Amino acid sequence: QPKSSPSVTLFPPSSEELETNKATLVCTITDFYPGVVTVDWKVDGTPVTQGMETTQPSKQSNNKYMASSYLTLTARAWERHSSYSCQVTHEGHTVEKSLSRADCS
C-alpha cells in the first residue's frame, strides 16, 4: 500500500463550551498510511506540554488511518493567547494547521 500524507483540520472550541469555562481544540488527522503519526501542539509558537491527548490511529474503510488530537484549556487560557497550531509529523514530513483566536470570535 502506497504512503499517504495526512489531511489535517483544526477546529476551535465552541462558544457553548467556552460558556462552561472550558476550551477544547480538536485536530483531526485523516487518510494517512502507514498508521503512525506524532502530534505536537503550539500556543503562540511555544510547544505545549500538558492538556493534550491524541487518540490511537484507527483504520478507515479505505485502509488508510485516522486519528484525533485534543488540546484542553480553560476559557481564560484560550482568551490569553492568540495563535494555536497543531503539527502532525508523518513519515518525516510535518503538516501544520494554525488558527488565530481573533478569527473565531
From Swiss-Prot:
A GO CC annotation given for this chain: IgG immunoglobulin complex
Miscellaneous section: The MOPC-315 cell line produces 2 light chains, 1 normal lambda-2 chain and 1 abnormal lambda-1 chain that is missing a large part of the V region. The C region sequence (shown here) appears completely normal.
Record-linked InterPro entries: Ig-like_dom, Ig-like_dom_sf, Ig-like_fold, Ig/MHC_CS, Ig_C1-set, MHC/Immunoglobulin
PANTHER family tied to this protein: IG-LIKE DOMAIN-CONTAINING PROTEIN, MHC CLASS II-RELATED
UniProt key word Disulfide bond: yes
Taxonomic classification: Eukaryota, Metazoa, Chordata, Craniata, Vertebrata
SMART domains: IGc1
Protein source organism: Mus musculus (Mouse)
UniProt entry keywords in alphabetical sequence: Disulfide bond, Immunoglobulin domain
Domain Ig-like: 6-100
Annotated Gene3D superfamilies: Immunoglobulins
Coiled coil stretches, renumbered: none
Protein name as catalogued: Ig lambda-1 chain C region
GO molecular function terms listed in the Swiss-Prot or TrEMBL record: antigen binding
Disulphide bond pairs: 27-86
GO biological process: immunoglobulin mediated immune response
